[in-house]
C-alpha cells in the first residue's frame, strides 16, 4: 500500500540528493524544482558526480545534443548502468526521448549514425511530434497519481507546456500511461492537425522510470516532481 500524496512540497524531498543532467537544456529550472521540495539538487556533468545520488532528472532541451555531450563527457555508459540497476530517473521532453528504448524518427549525424538513447523505458517515441517551436502550446491534462493542488480543492489537472514535444507511439506491457492529449481537448490550431483524431500519450511510468513530453518545471507545477520524490522514497 502506498502512502497518500503529501501537500507539504517544501519538505517532500528533505534529505535526498537529486542529480540533474546539466549538459544542455533547462537543467537550471529542474534544479530549482528539485530544491523547492527540500532536496539537494546536484548538476551532473561528469561521472564522479553520479556517486551518492538518490534520483536523476534528465531535462528538456535538444536530445541529440544531450546524447552527443553525454558520450563526450563519458556519462552515457554510467547512466545506462545506473538505469539498469534501478536508479529512479525522470525525463521531461528530451529526457523522455533519451529514456526511450526506441525512437521512431531518430536524428542522424554526418556519418549517418542514428542518435543514441540511455534507454530503460519500453516505449517508442516520435521526436518533435507536435510541431516546431512556433507550434508550441499549453493545455490542461488529467494526470494519474498526482498529489492535491495548492488550493486544496482536490486533484486538479496539470497545466502542461509543450515545446517541440515528443509523443509516445508504442508502450510495452510494463509501461503505465499517466496522461494523454485527447482530440476532444480544446482545439489549439498548433496541435489539432498533428493529432488527426488520435489520442497521444504524453506521460508514462515504468517502475523506477518516469517521463513526460511536457515541461512542468517551466510552469511552477510542483506535483510531477513531488511524484518523482515519492517514487524515490518508495511511496508511489
From Swiss-Prot:
Associated pathway: Cofactor biosynthesis; pyridoxal 5'-phosphate biosynthesis
Keyword Ligase listed: no
UniProt KW Acetylation keyword: no
EC number: 4.3.3.6, 3.5.1.2
Record GO terms (molecular function): glutaminase activity; pyridoxal 5'-phosphate synthase (glutamine hydrolysing) activity
Family affiliation: Belongs to the glutaminase PdxT/SNO family.
Name of the molecule in the record: Pyridoxal 5'-phosphate synthase subunit PdxT
Gene that produces this protein: pdxT
Amino acid at each position: 500500500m502506498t502512502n497518500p500524496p503529501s501537500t507539504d512540497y517544501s519538505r517532500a524531498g528533505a534529505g535526498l540528493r537529486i542529480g540533474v543532467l546539466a549538459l544542455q537544456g533547462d537543467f537550471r529550472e529542474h534544479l530549482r524544482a528539485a530544491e523547492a521540495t527540500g532536496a539537494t539538487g546536484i548538476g551532473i556533468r561528469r561521472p564522479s558526480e553520479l556517486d551518492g545520488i538518490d534520483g536523476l532528472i534528465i531535462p528538456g532541451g535538444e536530445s541529440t545534443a544531450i546524447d552527443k555531450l553525454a558520450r563526450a563527457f563519458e556519462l552515457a555508459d554510467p547512466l545506462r548502468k545506473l538505469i539498469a540497476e534501478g536508479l529512479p530517473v525522470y525525463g521531461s521532453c528530451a529526457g523522455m526521448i533519451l529514456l526511450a528504448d526506441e525512437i521512431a524518427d531518430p536524428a542522424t549525424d554526418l556519418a549517418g549514425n542514428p542518435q543514441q538513447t540511455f534507454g530503460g523505458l519500453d516505449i517508442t517515441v516520435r521526436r518533435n511530434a507536435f510541431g516546431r517551436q512556433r507550434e508550441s502550446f499549453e493545455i490542461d491534462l488529467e494526470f494519474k497519481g498526482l498529489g492535491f493542488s495548492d488550493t486544496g480543492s482536490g486533484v486538479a489537472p496539470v497545466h502542461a507546456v509543450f515545446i517541440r514535444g515528443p509523443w509516445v507511439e508504442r508502450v510495452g506491457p510494463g509501461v503505465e500511461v499517466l496522461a494523454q492529449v485527447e482530440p476532444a481537448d480544446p482545439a489549439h490550431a498548433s496541435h489539432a492537425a498533428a493529432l488527426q483524431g488520435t489520442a497521444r500519450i504524453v506521460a508514462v511510468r515504468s517502475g523506477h522510470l518516469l517521463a513526460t513530453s511536457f515541461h512542468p518545471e517551466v510552469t511552477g507545477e510542483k506535483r510531477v516532481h513531488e511524484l518523482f520524490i515519492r517514487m524515490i522514497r518508495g511511496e508511489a
